[in-house]
């Protein structure tokens, strides 16, 4: 099967660093992971032949860890340590930086107005979301009750969509997370942190939406 006919989410999991390539082209492989590469490229008016060629090069590299075949309990433990704990560190620091940048550079036209508010909203939503996963959904899956978790999983997927929408607002507010020439050190550091957060959150959502949840619902 050609890459263009495969879902973005599957490609992001099977090809090393494909997720970084999709991020470069602003293609949503987490919440929009079920759309094929061809459809995603068409929506962005991108040349699918060029992207396929880049994926073919990436596919030659060895994959570090194939989570599609890992035990569900191992995936859950990885998600908590690698993503949940990391987001809990990232967002408070980014909110502090955004507060400072918006205050100090309030008179500059390029200041990302509203960024503190949007990061705070994301922090509050994710804090509640991750707590529900850790206290309710993940224990159900670990106990082999994933096939009975359609309700909680549908809620989590809906909340993933909401987080994805907030990321789009944040990208719009920050000129696609690109610092202006006059940006100070804090401003640049904050944008580096936001880019890292976006990468982490998209990988996090993709692993749940495209691997953990479907396998849990299938009764593993």
Curated annotation (Swiss-Prot):
Assigned GO CC terms: cytoplasm
Keywords linked to the UniProt accession: Cytoplasm, Iron, Metal-binding, Stress response
Predominant place of localization: cytoplasm
Stored InterPro entries: FeS-repair_YftE, Hemerythrin-like, RIC_family
Compartments where found: Cytoplasm
Metal-binding recorded as keyword: yes
Gene Ontology process terms (BP): protein repair; response to nitrosative stress; response to oxidative stress
Protein's recorded name: Iron-sulfur cluster repair protein YtfE
Taxonomic source organism: Escherichia coli O1:K1 / APEC
